[in-house]
Amino acid sequence: MAGNAYSDEVLGVTNWLKDKSSQEVFSFVFKNENVQLNGKDIGWNSYRKELQDDELKSLQRGAETTWDQSEDMEWESAVDDMTKKQVFIFDSLVKKCLFEVLSTKNIAPSNVTWFVQHEWGKDPGWHCHVLIGGKDFSQPQGKWWRRQLNVYWSRWLVTACNVQLTPAERIKLREIAEDSEWVTLLTYKHKHTKKDYTKCVLFGNMIAYYFLSKKKICTSPPRDGGYFLSSDSGWKTNFLKEGERHLVSKLYTDEMKPETVETTVTTAQEAKRGRIQTREEVSIKTTLKELVHKRVTSPEDWMMMQPDSYIEMMAQPGGENLLKNTLEICTLTLARTKTAFDLILEKAETSKLANFSMASTRTCRIFAEHGWNYIKVCHAICCVLNRQGGKRNTVLFHGPASTGKSIIAQAIAQAVGNVGCYNAANVNFPFNDCTNKNLIWVEEAGNFGQQVNQFKAICSGQTIRIDQKGKGSKQIEPTPVIMTTNENITVVRIGCEERPEHTQPIRDRMLNIHLTRTLPGDFGLVDKHEWPLICAWLVKNGYQSTMACYCAKWGKVPDWSEDWAEPKLDTPINSLGSMRSPSLTPRSTPLSQNYALTPLASDLADLALEPWSTPNTPVAGTAASQNTGEAGSTACQGAQRSPTWSEIEADLRACFSQEQLESDFNEELTLD
């Protein structure tokens, strides 16, 4: 920039201050006051006693060198030798105090950044500014540093005092110095607590903007304010002359000035608030954002996913209540901003959608075993989970045991995460766990009894208030319900009396999914990634989770007597006991099914003429089609399921026509 216009010393100091521009340091002021003890006056220049400590002598010689090197040769300084000597002694005493405190903290001076400047003011007279900081310094340590420096400063002042004092007067002088706080720390007063807290300053900014811009004192006694000498840990400002100091200040100011001025708009609410957030508030808000982002809804999830923040809050006073309230805010945020369908959908791994087959999922295999259109059933469930079912806000899985009700409901609840459970054992507060949730799970529901009206309100998605144990009432917002049962919940009994007036209202609030086929023992559980992929597949293929889309796809809103088998699917589904791909399933043929018979001669005519059928099995085809050799083979070829009685009959008629049976039987008789 200006390598040819400025000296290397000026540019070196400027770059050094820029490197330290963001370092926070303590700001101390050393001073003394005029004291009178038993008629003896002790002023600011009464501390010129010759020092016997070798380290103090070395520090004093360093101050003398700094003064000589920073003198401007264009004019001669008018400061007398007595004033100079007093400043040199003060400089050595201040640095001695700093080094002694560093020694007590086991901090190496090389790891510390400091700056010292002696000044004269109209009101305080002589005083010394000290900036000190480093990686081992923190804001709460500021007051401890002030107390320690005050003790060392008072002790060394008494040692350097050249006024003849008795031992008692020396002790009194030290008490005055300590009680009057001749070492002060820069602090600020909190608006609400009214307490003083340490205020750190930026090292580079404070030196360039404040200290280097001052004028040097050249008269004795000093008439105006200014500085005597300054030094620092990097030996950068020690030997700068007054003009060079002003030039460094100007260069630093020009380079650190922002190019554009950012304007901020403060709303009336923010201006009215006018408060400073505490560190605890900022920490809680940061933790809360992380919990919501990671969908943490229980203390166990918090312990596993964010153990550091959990331990930090637990260690604070009232930590248990703080954890509970923070988690409640997190679940409330999820319940108000997301639906159960949203929470399931965001867990889908889109990379698996390309090879995903909805027909191969355990959920769809259960539905297909009942002959249902599994896409239609899943679409209806997703509409309810997305709060689009209107008054029909509950998915009811009912039927005999071991038909897959609970494993489907469990997979959905696990995918949602933020789930509340109905507790039938808690007669007075059964919905205690159902507030601020995205889904309510009612497992093995029974007779509603006295709670039927509450159940109807929650199952229809109404906003109601419930009582909680040890608390006041709390509001439950519209929340989808998933319910499993082996009983007929539409029959309400209060005492020994049935209430049929509740049957139809309960049916109007339910998405009826009646499972009747028992699963084999090796069927297994529904995978946790299954429902997220099902939801993503539906969205990808145009089955949006809205009732308008459902009606456009399937014709009408689902009701209690909904026929899930219509419209039929063309895609075959494997049986429940098989985990193989449909392409690997062997075709059903007469030879593979081992339907060979050896009829008697008297029964040949009956076998060929009378249809083999049961009261529940329709007769297969006409006589013309039954007597052809192709009818039986086509009845089972290409099918991916077990043959019906009609297909078996067609196969037998194809293999054992009357003429063929008589011919085979006659051949056997001839051989015998």
From Swiss-Prot:
SUPFAM superfamilies named in the record: Origin of replication-binding domain, RBD-like (SSF55464), P-loop containing nucleoside triphosphate hydrolases (SSF52540)
Binding-site residues for ATP, renumbered to this chain: G399, P400, A401, S402, T403, G404, K405, S406
Active site: Y210
GO molecular function, one term: ATP hydrolysis activity
PTM comment: Phosphorylated.
Positions of short motif RCR-2: 127-129
Requisite cofactors: Mg(2+)
InterPro entries: Helicase_SF3_DNA-vir, P-loop_NTPase, Parvovirus_NS1_C, Parvovirus_NS1_helicase, Parvovirus_NS1_N, PV_NS1-NUC
Top-level taxon: Viruses
Domain PV NS1-Nuc: 21-259
Binding note for cofactor: The endonuclease active site can probably bind other divalent cations.
Motif RCR-3 per record, residues: 210-214
Catalysed transformations (reactions): ATP + H2O = ADP + phosphate + H(+)
Primary residence: host cell
Binding annotation for a divalent metal cation: E119, H127, H129
Region annotated DNA-binding, chain positions: 1-276
Keyword Secreted: no
Keywords assigned: ATP-binding, Covalent protein-DNA linkage, DNA replication, DNA-binding, Endonuclease, G1/S host cell cycle checkpoint dysregulation by virus, Helicase, Host G2/M cell cycle arrest by virus, Host nucleus, Host-virus interaction, Hydrolase, Magnesium, Metal-binding, Modulation of host cell apoptosis by virus, Modulation of host cell cycle by virus, Nuclease, Nucleotide-binding, Transcription, Transcription regulation, Viral DNA replication, Viral genome packaging, Viral release from host cell
GO terms (BP aspect): DNA replication; symbiont-mediated arrest of host cell cycle during G2/M transition; symbiont-mediated perturbation of host apoptosis; symbiont-mediated perturbation of host cell cycle G1/S transition checkpoint; viral DNA genome replication
Ori-binding: annotated segments: 191-195
Disordered, as annotated region: 615-643
GO CC field: host cell nucleus
Record text about domains: In the N-terminus, the endonuclease region is involved in binding to the origin of replication. In the middle, there are the ATPase and helicase activities. The C-terminus probably contains a transactivation domain.
Job of this protein: Multifunctional protein which displays endonuclease and helicase activities required for initiating and directing viral DNA replication. Also plays a role in viral packaging and transactivation of several promoters. Binds site-specifically to 2-3 approximate tandem copies within the origins of replication (Ori), unwinds this hairpin region and nicks one DNA strand thereby initiating the rolling circle replication (RCR). Cooperatively binds Ori with host PIF and probably other host factors, which activate the nickase function of NS1.
Family label: Belongs to the parvoviruses initiator protein NS1 family.
Protein name, as recorded: Initiator protein NS1
Originating gene: NS1
